[in-house]
Amino acid sequence: DRWNKKLLLKKKLLKVIENNFIKYGFDPLETPSFEIAENIGSFLAEDESNPMSDVFSFKDGTKDITLRYDLSSPLARFVAQNNQDLPPIFKRYAIQNVFRNEKAGNARYREFTQADCDIVGNVNPAQANAELCNLIASTLLECSLKTDQFIINVSNRKIIQGLIKDLKIPDSKQTKVMRAIDKLDKPGFGLRGVEDLL
């Protein structure tokens, strides 16, 4: 639960974030809390035999329904369904709660608010990354952080996939390795936790 000063601070920070999204030309998108499981693909689940284990899901008649795990999967579904109506470069932001079916712990929540923005379409990746870095930096500065109080990391999944391929990791283990790498900087994991996953 959040109330009083903590909730007011959260609302104030989210307003700063949203104002910066708008200032940088991003349009708002709101998606349902529930998605049809087959529309959102698989997640980075610990249990490879049950790739949807990290999401809250249930059956609605004959369909598997899940609570929104992140904001990227609903964006992918939205773009696929509305591609004909979208501009060549689609800049969208979303600020909504997401849900994780995992053990709650220090800095790990089953429900939390995610603020997300993406640039989709015919765009130069370097330009898009530069714009997003500028947006992040200006937002953090407006939230009263100083430049020596934050670091912006840019990662590219294709680079990691290329390294995995160069290391000749078998196809059957590549997904597990990607999942482990994804956990590297998460609280409570670190190098030892990643080694245990592998």
Stretches with model-predicted labels:
Residues 1-198:
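Extended, charged alpha-beta segments that form solvent-exposed binding/catalytic grooves
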